[in-house]
Amino acid sequence: MELVGFLCVAVAVLTWGFLRVWNSAERMRSPEQAGLPGAGSRALVVIAHPDDEAMFFAPTMLGLARLEQQVSLLCFSSGNYYNQGEIRKKELLQSCAVLGIPPSRVMIIDKRDFPDDPEVQWDTELVASTLLQHIHANGTDLVVTFDAEGVSGHSNHIALYKAVRALHSGGKLPKGCSVLTLQSVNALRKYAFLLDLPWTLLSPQDVLFVLTSKEVAQAKKAMSCHRSQLLWFRYLYVLFSRYMRINSLRFL
């Protein structure tokens, strides 16, 4: 038992050290060094449902803002699976405000073509054409969305990846527009933040955002705006999930 206790303390101390070192390193890195567009560039975070921005992308959104990029958000549904669409749209706007994104830069697509339903496969071409319209309208330099596994495996998340991959591979994106996808990890890493951080720092990724303690509090506050979704297991998610603190991303 003493050995187990010692190992737990050692892991906690090492993780704290990693956090301090990474916080310093992250603040010294320029967008160019990270392979990102420079300050003043326009980033578009593309999500499927209200609360995706807080549950999965808060580190990216706050990290890009830290790098002085103008962040906008495009949500492909109102999250109306339980007939709460109007409530969830308001919650999304509140959450984005906490994350520093004004209502003028939040776009919610509420169409029958894109229902909040894991059993429905969104049409890739329709998602891609809709996304491309918003990319052009916003003068987007960087698109950020889910990877092929969708973090949680939700079919709506994966549909966004398929659409942006189709645009990228088909050469349809505007010149100079880059795409970042949020890396999915296994369940152990997903819910063991303290153990995951050293692993993440040693793993390959193109861009890594780690939140400071102040920014973590900001991300939690954003998540708390989604009151209709705060079931008991979501509180555990907020406490333990890496995605409330860490985003590792890869370029397409």
From Swiss-Prot:
Subcellular location: Endoplasmic reticulum membrane
Reaction catalysis annotation: a 6-(N-acetyl-alpha-D-glucosaminyl)-1-(1,2-diacyl-sn-glycero-3-phospho)-1D-myo-inositol + H2O = a 6-(alpha-D-glucosaminyl)-1-(1,2-diacyl-sn-glycero-3-phospho)-1D-myo-inositol + acetate
GO molecular function terms noted in the UniProt entry: N-acetylglucosaminylphosphatidylinositol deacetylase activity
Membrane-related topology note: Single-pass type I membrane protein
EC number(s) stated in the UniProt entry for this protein: 3.5.1.89
Membrane-spanning parts: 2-22
Biological processes, Gene Ontology terms: GPI anchor biosynthetic process
Pathway recorded for this protein: Glycolipid biosynthesis; glycosylphosphatidylinositol-anchor biosynthesis
UniProt feature coiled coil, ranges: none
Catalytic class of the enzyme: hydrolase
Cytoplasmic side, ranges: 23-252
The name this protein goes by in its record: N-acetylglucosaminyl-phosphatidylinositol de-N-acetylase
Organism phylogeny: Eukaryota, Metazoa, Chordata, Craniata, Vertebrata
